[in-house]
Amino acid sequence: MSAPAVEIDAQYRQLREECGLLEHPDFGLLVVDGAEAAEYLQGQLTNDVEAIEPGDGAYAALLDRKGHMQADMRVLRPGEGPELWLLLEPAGLAAASRHLQMYKIGREVEVRDASEERSLISLIGPRAAEIAGSAPLPENACEAVTVGGAECVAVGAAAGIDLVVLADERGRARDALLAAGAAEVSAEAAEILRIESGRPRFGAEMGTETMPAEAGIVEQAVSFTKGCYIGQETVARLHYKGKPNRHLRGLRFSGQAAPGEVLRVGEKEVGTVGSAAVSPALGRVGLAILRREAEPGATVAVGEDGVTAEVVALPFG
C-alpha cells in the first residue's frame, strides 16, 4: 500500500532539505576475497577493478557474452587487504553469485554471499554525511565510521551516504542516526528522487535484455582501457562504431501510470514503463528505455486506458 500524498510530500521535503533514513532489508552483498580477487573480477566486470585503491570503489556491470546486463553493482575495497565487496540490487544478486561462483574454478578466490550478515542503511539528503559522522565522500568511496557504537562502512552514494553495518548492530546504528536528526522515509519517497535524477535501477529500467549503452551508464560503469571481460566486444563495437537502438528517457504522464505498462507510438511498441511516481516538484514522471522512434518531444500511448506521456531528455528540466 502506498503512503498518503501528504505524508509523501513531507518525506520528500525531508530528503531534499534535511536527511531521510531508508533501510534496505533485501540488499545484496557478495564478498570476493583471495590473492586473485581483483584479477578475477577484472575479467568479469566492465570497470577497472584492479585500479580500485583501499577506501575507494567503482560502479560496474556484469554482462553475458552478448553484452546484456546480468547485474550492476558497486565494487568497494573497504580495507588494505585483497577483499572486495559487491553491493547489488536484489534483482541481480542470484545471477551475479551464480556467475562468479561458476567461473572462479582453479583460482585463489573465494566468493561468499554476505547479504544476511550485514544490513544497508541509506542516509539521503544534504545532512547525510554530518549525521553519519563521515566526511563528505565521493560516490563509491568508502571509509570506516562508528555510529552509536556500531562499526560501519560508510559509502558515498549519489544522494547521500550508505552505511553497511553488521545485521545484529543495525538497530543500534539506526537509533543513533535518528537521534542525530535523520527521519525515517519510505522507499516510495526515495524513489521519487531517483526518478527525478534520471538514474536507472536494475530490476526497474534495466534488466537482462539491457545493454549498458541503452541505459546511459557507459561513462560511469565501463572502462575502455582495461583488459578483456565477458561481453566486451559488443560494448566496444557499439561504443566506437554503432548506435544503440534504445535509450533511457524521461516520461511526463498525463495521468496515472504503472511500471510494466506498454508504451506505443501509433501501433508500434517502443518500450515499457520502468518506474513511475508523482513528484511534488515535477508532477507525474517516470523512466523507461525506449526505441529510437520515441525521441524527446514525442508522445507515447501508455497502456490501454488513454493515458499518454511526453518523452523528455534526461535530466528532467
PLM feature spans:
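Acidic, low-complexity central loop/insert segments
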Residues: 20-22, 29, 74-200
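Short, conserved active-site entrance elements at the starts or edges of catalytic domains
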Residues: 193-216, 257
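Short amphipathic beta-strand starts and helix->beta connectors
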Residues: 8-17, 60-72, 104-107, 144-153, ...
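Short, solvent-exposed amphipathic alpha-helical segments in soluble enzyme
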Residues: 45-50, 91, 100-105, 177-182, ...
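Acidic, proline/glycine-enriched N-terminal capping motif
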Residues: 1-70, 77-80
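Glycine-rich, small/acidic residue-mixed loop/short-helix segments
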Residues: 73, 210, 215-223, 228-232, ...
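Residue-level signal for inorganic ion chemistry
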Residues: 34, 86, 123-125, 163, ...
